[in-house]
Amino acid sequence: CARRIWRSMAADAYTAKDLRVAPISRADADRVVRLLHYSGKVVPNSQLHLGVFLGDRLEGAMQFGPSMDKRKTLGLVRGTPWNGFLELNRMAFSDRLPRNSESRAMAVAFRMIRRAYPHIEWVVSFSDAAQCGDGAIYRAAGFLLTGIKPNNQILQLPNGSLVARVTVTK
């Protein structure tokens, strides 16, 4: 049958349309983020955890939740109620996923959010250009670039690990 042949194909034969996005547990999402995200850190107040599957394998995760600094972010879109937006806190994908997986997975996730949480009007995310580019995958998914500024909030410790400035005490 065609399905059996499709499943036996090499991973590079997959396209972004072959991805499946589905809810996963916080524990599974945290594990993927710790393993694959450049910071190795999760956002503790994330509330919605979506897995990105290629075949039966979990190859990525997206974690959504309230914005880390809601007062500053709320003003980006005039008239937004306090609970009217989410932040894509973390997105971590394995290199085994095909081209355009990020924008495809975000599009599917946004449709899921729109259906399940109709009060959510928009999603915000931040891209660290020093670590992972200039936000091109976000713009490909329909995000608007609202600003670029130097990142002075991530510090590299002498042992090479990355930490948020707010977690370091003097």
Q: Which residues fall in each region the model found?
A:
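Acyl-donor binding region in acyl/amide transferases
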Residues: 20-23, 47, 65-170
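Conserved beta-hairpin
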Residues: 33, 46-66
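A generic structural signal for short, solvent-exposed coil/turn residues
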Residues: 13, 42-44, 56, 80, ...
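Short amphipathic alpha-helix that is part of the acyltransferase structural core
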Residues: 3-44
